[in-house]
């Protein structure tokens, strides 16, 4: 990219005006998006306006449309809801209302509109855009606007960001607010679980989702529910019988509680609603269990946005500004959305159409079609739920294989969820599943036992590692490990852990030359707070650590805001990998994040101090600086603290916090529970296939490179990659992958902190078309 192109982003918005509004139901993370739109808009030289109270503010004009400043979006990131207000607006549905809205925009020279809301809000925006030229000619005829004003505002650019806790919009994997809503639900499920266990109760939990069962489905995966009712997949006609049998089976196996999750729009095959009360009455009447209903309601919309939603909102906000300013009269109104971890632009009306098609398919009782249209991610969730909740392990173990599961490295939240789904999917497939305590050390010492179905009951929501985990590598103990593989007849190995799990995998590959016993398939599931395992964009546990850091940063910022003129320097974990520091910097609104992956000098430190000196002259008199623990051996946390203290004398004072091992603890977030559960299921499916493939002459012999893999999330898919092939992509000295996708997000962090830098637009989203899944097509 040339310097001219770089420079173009800083002048892209000169002479242009952008209005941002939030409409429809509020969602956590909307404020992060508003903040990003305002700051990136100002960065490009554009004027940015808040439209208060959604479309109603657009119609009413006056003080509802105000110009935004850099400081006016400060301290917004950690707030739930929408600071600029939202309202359901009848006026905008009428042409007269849209005419007044057009007049208000033209008078202010605004030709770019960023709408953050659900499908109704975005459809309204598209209607507005398609009528724009007719509305202008009506205003001209009425003499309300001049010919010059009409020419200047000849076309309207519209970009939508989907803010909806239901995740009911087709074309995007996650809508802004969904992850935070899941946080609220899971907090409540965890709290209710303890009281239900004490009294041996059945809990019926109703969550939001009139036409979309995403929240209910992911909640059931994240808490190991016994049953879920969602509108897209109504239960079979004899569901009452099946449900009661399932609940009593769970109790017989020693469980003290049952959890049933119901989406508010749940229906049966004939379209008749299934209510929480119906389910409660059924369980009480047929089984006599003490059953309680909890309807969550608007709690789900409330509270602090999760780290995921803050980062999603910020990334989408940046993309929205770029899409608006690059727009021409010929570009269609688009939605900025997320696919895997990639930002994409999709034509707004294509997405709205597919979203309507889902509702239509459900109305016509074509439920398979509705499920396909929901997309790949939804279908994967449904398949894993069905396996874990509805398929029973076979009674006979004849012809079964033996698979061992272990944790390696440091503890990470979500490890237990991965172990649970690996064990249970293994049992469902008719295998014997062994669990190994204390990693490779335990494998060498024979700390191995067989796991049954209830062995891993209730593990999904528990943090840390219940099996015990060690950083020990296998090389020194190959003889003992080989002996135990033979003794316990282990035919496959699932290794859940961090960089040591990956390195251990490489050592096992090498050891195959000497020890035939090591020629068994193995798969590594990345699980570490550092997110530094080659072959995967995400690791189990990183999201939980990120949320822990965010919560702490919010509290520290609050303290600094009260004290005034104070800068906090916070040290995060991650070894040499700067993922936690960078992402927490984005999510908590840090002024700087020092990491090993982006070398810095004393001049950079001085520039940051000078930047904070300037910041103290504004209304925002506080600073937050993050430092990755191994970003530089000489510029330590103490050094940076001392430098800031000296240079800031008389202007600001400094404090330091080393967060330490609290980042490894805590209950796993919904993202980590769900991600770990799906990874475990996928790993075990692969393992069963590989064992069958490698079975020759009555024994397993696997010595091909593809029989030892890392299962990783790469851009938009879960893929198995041979560990040997990942060797070249690894910096072993610093225990990090050579290429890390999140480094591309660092310029956004700097721009949002008001640094004058170049923004490389080469990696921005381009317009794509929505891929539609029809009946009969396989989910990837």
UniProtKB/Swiss-Prot annotation:
What positions constitute the catalytic site? 166 (proton acceptor)
Q: Which GO terms describe its biological process?
A: canonical glycolysis; fructose 1,6-bisphosphate metabolic process; fructose 6-phosphate metabolic process
Q: Which residues carry this modification: N6-(2-hydroxyisobutyryl)lysine?
A: 557
**Residues bearing glycans:** 530
- List residues binding beta-D-fructose 2,6-bisphosphate: 471, 528-532, 566, 573-575, 629, 655, 661-664, 735
What keywords were assigned to this record?
Acetylation, Allosteric enzyme, ATP-binding, Cytoplasm, Glycolysis, Glycoprotein, Hydroxylation, Kinase, Magnesium, Metal-binding, Nucleotide-binding, Phosphoprotein, Transferase
Q: Which residues carry this modification: N-acetylthreonine?
A: 2
Region (Interdomain linker) residue spans: 391-401
- Pathway(s) it belongs to: Carbohydrate degradation; glycolysis; D-glyceraldehyde 3-phosphate and glycerone phosphate from D-glucose: step 3/4
Q: Which residues carry this modification: Phosphoserine?
A: 133, 377, 667, 775
Start and end residues of each stretch annotated as C-terminal regulatory PFK domain 2: 402-780
Q: What is its EC number?
A: 2.7.1.11
What reaction(s) does this enzyme catalyze? beta-D-fructose 6-phosphate + ATP = beta-D-fructose 1,6-bisphosphate + ADP + H(+)
Subcellular location, in the record's words? Cytoplasm
Name the domain of life.
Answer: Eukaryota
Q: How is it modified after translation?
A: GlcNAcylation decreases enzyme activity.
Mind telling me which Gene3D superfamilies this protein's record contains? Answer: 3.40.50.450, Phosphofructokinase domain
**An example molecular function term from Gene Ontology annotations:** metal ion binding
Q: Name one GO cellular component term.
A: 6-phosphofructokinase complex
How is the quaternary structure described? Homo- and heterotetramers. Phosphofructokinase (PFK) enzyme functions as a tetramer composed of different combinations of 3 types of subunits, called PFKM (M), PFKL (L) and PFKP (P). The composition of the PFK tetramer differs according to the tissue type it is present in. The kinetic and regulatory properties of the tetrameric enzyme are dependent on the subunit composition, hence can vary across tissues. Interacts (via C-terminus) with HK1 (via N-terminal spermatogenic cell-specific region).
What job does the chain carry out? Answer: Catalyzes the phosphorylation of D-fructose 6-phosphate to fructose 1,6-bisphosphate by ATP, the first committing step of glycolysis.
Family membership: Belongs to the phosphofructokinase type A (PFKA) family. ATP-dependent PFK group I subfamily. Eukaryotic two domain clade 'E' sub-subfamily.
Question: What name does UniProt use for this protein?
Answer: ATP-dependent 6-phosphofructokinase, muscle type
Q: Which organism is it from?
A: Pongo abelii (Sumatran orangutan)
